[in-house]
């Protein structure tokens, strides 16, 4: 059978079950208010990961512009050839200081960081233990590593302990999201750290959604839990969310970072981030550490939204993060609600399996410090109207 016919069959199958994904073309910069191709009016976006609203900050843009004038657009090669600029190096040092760790290492994307770390540290004869709701990049890293792959029930440390007790692997790595990207809840890091120590395992935390939003000065979930390098030897963070730029990093000991420079194939065999992105991230890191009002405002908006949903009897997940999903169940219902919200001026993406478990399609609502109280109030009013309308449609079927 030809490639074309096989792929057409796959695409048709996805369309038939409401799993076909498509892109929308933005006509304006990423922000709270966006113009989108096919829409006659501006949409208020409640689906971005720009949690602190730094992506369009004038100081971040200026840092990027100045560095681009000096370094040009591309880095030219990998970090180990001639692509490692002073901007990269200084950003790594500043991220290490920010996380309170001896060293940090930049990666081009969060996906590459997770793949590189897990594959660099594990192989045949080892074992990796992952929360069932971990991000795809963590799961893929574990599957490709060749290590024995275990998945424990979400935030269930007893289940994890049972798996660890049975393992005879030479190296054992526990891997979790700090804040789970689709549910918005946090990992039980204190219990996980205790389990790791008890069973002589290593703990890796992907705090992509915690950095900037949680902990003292936005230092993340690990910091919020009072854990140290000894508890969490491998800490990963992304730069494309609260930092508002692009890329990722891993922070840890001198030995860990030197080992990853040698062993992480996704670091060794790829072009370095543009120096201008590193310069912009240095500016956003400074803002993240000094403009505390952004986190304070974001947290106030989160509480406003959760209180409003409670008043409307809309059930939310147990999340205190900017990620506030409303689980709707069926894929078609989630798509319908997303469409109706767009008609009322809101851009909220419907998230469907396999990104989330079967039967848990949802609106993944995310809040930003750039939103206003009025934006959230308008969102709640629109949700109330749409949910009444959809409920009536379902009852009449």
UniProtKB/Swiss-Prot annotation:
InterPro entries referenced in this protein's UniProt entry, alphabetically:
Aminotrans_II_pyridoxalP_BS, Aminotransferase_I/II_large, AON_synthase_class-II, AONS_Archaea/Proteobacteria, AONS_Proteobacteria, PyrdxlP-dep_Trfase, PyrdxlP-dep_Trfase_major, PyrdxlP-dep_Trfase_small
* Pathway where it operates: Cofactor biosynthesis; biotin biosynthesis
Q: What is its EC number?
A: 2.3.1.47
Q: Which cofactor does it need?
A: pyridoxal 5'-phosphate
Segments passing through the bilayer: none
Q: Catalytic activity, per the record?
A: 6-carboxyhexanoyl-[ACP] + L-alanine + H(+) = (8S)-8-amino-7-oxononanoate + holo-[ACP] + CO2
Provide any one GO MF term from the record.
8-amino-7-oxononanoate synthase activity
Residues where substrate binds? 21, 135, 355
Q: What PROSITE patterns would the database entry show? A: AA_TRANSFER_CLASS_2
Tell me the residues on which N6-(pyridoxal phosphate)lysine occurs: 241
Q: Name one GO biological process term.
A: biotin biosynthetic process
Keyword annotations: Biotin biosynthesis, Pyridoxal phosphate, Transferase
Residues engaged in binding pyridoxal 5'-phosphate: 110-111, 181, 209, 238
Family annotation (HAMAP family):
BioF_aminotrans_2 (MF_01693)
Role this protein plays: Catalyzes the decarboxylative condensation of pimeloyl-[acyl-carrier protein] and L-alanine to produce 8-amino-7-oxononanoate (AON), [acyl-carrier protein], and carbon dioxide.
The record's PANTHER family line, in alphabetical order, gives: 8-AMINO-7-OXONONANOATE SYNTHASE, CLASS II AMINOTRANSFERASE/8-AMINO-7-OXONONANOATE SYNTHASE
Subunit field text: Homodimer.
Family designation: Belongs to the class-II pyridoxal-phosphate-dependent aminotransferase family. BioF subfamily.
Q: What is the name listed in the Swiss-Prot or TrEMBL entry for this protein?
A: 8-amino-7-oxononanoate synthase
Q: Which organism is it from?
A: Saccharophagus degradans (strain 2-40 / ATCC 43961 / DSM 17024)
């Amino acid at each position: 059978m030809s490639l074309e016919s096989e792929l057409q069959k796959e695409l048709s199958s996805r369309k038939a079950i409401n799993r076909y994904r498509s892109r929308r073309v933005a006509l304006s910069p990423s922000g709270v208010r966006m113009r989108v191709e096919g829409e006659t009016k501006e949409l208020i976006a409640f689906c971005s990961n720009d949690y602190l609203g730094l992506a369009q900050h004038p100081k971040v843009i200026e840092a990027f512009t100045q560095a681009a004038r000096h370094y040009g657009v591309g880095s030219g090669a990998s970090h180990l050839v001639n692509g490692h600029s002073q901007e990269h190096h200084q950003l790594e040092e500043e991220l290490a200081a920010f996380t309170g760790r001896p060293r940090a290492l930049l990666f081009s994307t969060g996906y590459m960081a997770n793949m590189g770390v897990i594959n660099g540290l594990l192989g045949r004869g080892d074992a990796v233990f992952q929360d069932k709701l971990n991000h795809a990049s963590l799961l893929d890293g574990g599957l490709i590593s060749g290590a024995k792959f275990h998945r424990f029930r979400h935030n269930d440390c007893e289940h994890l302990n049972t798996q660890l007790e049975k393992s005879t692997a030479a190296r054992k790595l526990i891997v979790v999201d700090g804040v789970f990207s689709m549910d918005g809840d946090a990992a039980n890091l204190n219990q996980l750290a205790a389990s790791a120590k008890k069973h002589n395992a290593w703990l890796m935390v992907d705090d992509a959604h915690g950095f900037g939003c949680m902990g003292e000065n936005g230092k993340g979930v690990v910091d919020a839990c009072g854990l140290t390098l000894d508890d969490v030897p491998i800490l990963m963070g992304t730069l494309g969310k609260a930092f508002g730029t692009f890329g990722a990093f891993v922070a840890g000991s001198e030995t860990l970072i030197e080992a990853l420079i040698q062993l992480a194939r996704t670091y060794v065999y790829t072009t370095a981030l543009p120096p201008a992105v590193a310069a912009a991230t240095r500016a956003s890191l400074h803002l993240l550490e000094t403009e505390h009002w952004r986190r304070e405002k974001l947290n106030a908006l989160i509480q406003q939204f959760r209180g409003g949903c409670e008043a409307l009897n809309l059930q939310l997940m147990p999340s205190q993060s900017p990620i506030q999903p409303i689980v709707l169940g069926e894929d078609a219902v989630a798509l319908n609600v997303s469409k109706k919200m767009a008609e009322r001026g809101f851009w909220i993406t419907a998230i469907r399996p396999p990104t989330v478990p079967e039967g848990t399609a949802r609106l993944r609502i995310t809040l930003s410090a750039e939103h206003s109280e009025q934006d959230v109030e308008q969102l709640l009013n629109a949700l109330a109207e749409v949910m009444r309308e959809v409920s009536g449609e379902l009852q009449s079927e």
